[in-house]
Structure formats: structure tokens, C-alpha cells
């Protein structure tokens, strides 16, 4: 589990939430509960995934792209252009948030997801 333990260790530039003892304890616990084989698969998947190519332009369903402004791997400068490639996608940029947006700012993510559900329901009614 050591190769991913850095997710539980705050660094300069991390969100306020990620620097709290509660976040550190929660994330450390979650990581320690994982099967090492599953973590190895996750690492291989992350580094071996292909580029998206033209896939985003083919998405026609209501979509949501969420990004934490402090996310080192998928921050708004990466995710906003992705959202712009998806017709009708909503983009949410969460201030003072890193990679674990649903853990760091659960209320913001929940509101965004509820909004997406309403958009899906409206699309179904109008189909």
C-alpha cells in the first residue's frame, strides 16, 4: 500500500481539508484496508490508460465534470477543456479542493450531482 500512501499525506498546495487530522486518518484507514493486488491494478490502470481521443465529442447525455482547483492531476486547466468538448456538459470548479472532491467537499459535490440528476430527468421527459 506504500506506493499510494502519499494520497493520505498532505503537502504544500493541498486543500485545507486534506491537511486536517480527520482527513489524514480517514484516508490512511481506507488505504490500509485495500487489497494490495487491487492497489497494484489501480496503479497500472492509471499509468496505462489511453488518451480520450474524440470520445468526449460523442457524448450526448447530460454530463457533469467536477474539478478541484488544487487537484495536481486533473485541475480546472485540464478538466474545463474536457467539459467544453462535451455538448451541454456542466463544469464545476471547487475552490480549496484537491483530487478527492467528494471527500473534501461532499455538500458541493452532492448539489452538483443532484443538479445532474434533475437534468437527466428533464431530458428523459423531453425525449
Give the label of every model feature segment.
Residues 56-60, 84-86:
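Short, conserved loop/helix-junction motifs that constitute active-site signature segments
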Residues 31, 71-74, 98-101:
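Glycosyltransferase donor-binding loop in the core domain
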Residues 27, 43, 82, 109, ...:
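Hydrophobic "lid"/C-terminal helical patch
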Residues 54, 77-81, 104-108:
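Generic recognition of short, well-ordered alpha-helical segments
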Residues 58-59, 65-67, 71:
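Short beta-strand/loop motif that positions the catalytic acidic residue
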Amino acid at each position: 500500500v506504500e506506493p499510494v500512501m502519499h494520497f493520505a499525506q498532505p503537502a504544500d498546495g493541498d486543500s485545507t481539508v486534506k491537511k486536517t487530522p480527520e482527513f489524514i486518518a480517514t484516508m490512511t484507514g481506507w488505504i490500509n484496508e485495500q487489497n494490495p493486488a487491487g492497489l497494484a491494478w489501480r496503479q497500472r490502470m492509471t499509468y496505462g490508460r489511453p488518451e480520450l481521443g474524440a470520445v468526449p465529442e460523442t457524448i450526448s447525455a447530460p454530463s457533469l465534470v467536477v474539478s478541484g482547483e488544487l487537484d495536481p492531476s486533473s485541475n480546472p486547466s485540464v478538466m474545463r477543456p474536457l467539459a467544453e468538448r462535451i455538448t451541454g456538459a456542466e463544469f464545476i470548479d471547487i475552490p480549496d479542493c484537491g483530487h478527492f472532491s467528494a471527500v473534501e467537499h461532499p455538500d458541493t459535490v452532492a448539489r452538483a450531482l443532484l443538479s445532474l440528476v434533475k437534468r437527466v430527468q428533464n431530458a428523459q421527459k423531453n425525449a
